[in-house]
Amino acid sequence: MTMNRFALTLTTLLLMGCGSDKDATQALPSVDNTAEVLAFYETHADFFRAGSIDDLPEDLVWEDGADLPEVGSPKAKKGGTEYVRLADFPRTLRTVGPDSNGSFRPWILDDTSMALAHRHPETLDYFPGLALRWAVDTDSKSVFVELDPKATWSDGVPITADDYRFTFWFFRTRYITAPWYNNWYESQYTGITKYSDHLISIS
């Protein structure tokens, strides 16, 4: 039994040694799909709309969550380490698409990404994330959002309205191999409007 294990281990190591790491060191070619995305915007101009500040409803009531209490107790001891276990081995590092909805997803998306606004755990009202402030227009079933001009991606590039327009292209495209997301973003929203680099509405 022990001899068989040794032979199997040795064979595995030999096979691994025969492989070439040439493919592992080659980076995938970068793809500039700007033309494709812009063409999609034009083809779906009824969804990807453009406006100006003058087009905003005059009676919007803006909110920013400034009246909400601090999250957690000020007496709580900050810092420390929490140890948890994963229910299964990560099937993928994708956040959308095949096998992306596993128990590892909260660690790379749900619990780590920043949304436009987040729910306060006590009051359940919203406080800012990437949004500076927001307003709801019930007549048009739209949410108007002013993005925080200080918000950036991890590389320091500012987050703008174009990023949110691209988000809707991304979730509607068949490239992601995620029919549920395709259906949701095509059926539950009627459009996104860009008023400026930091002002959008989602309907």
Language-model segments: residues:
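Sec-dependent signal peptide recognition
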Residues: 2-11
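Short, surface-exposed charged micro-motifs
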Residues: 74, 133-135, 191
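C-terminal motif of bacterial Sec signal peptides marking the signal peptidase cleavage site
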Residues: 16-17
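Bacterial Sec signal peptide processing site at the extreme N-terminus
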Residues: 20-31
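N-terminal lobe/hinge region of extracytoplasmic solute-binding protein
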Residues: 49-70, 79-138, 169
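Surface-exposed binding/hinge segments that line
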Residues: 22, 77, 181-203
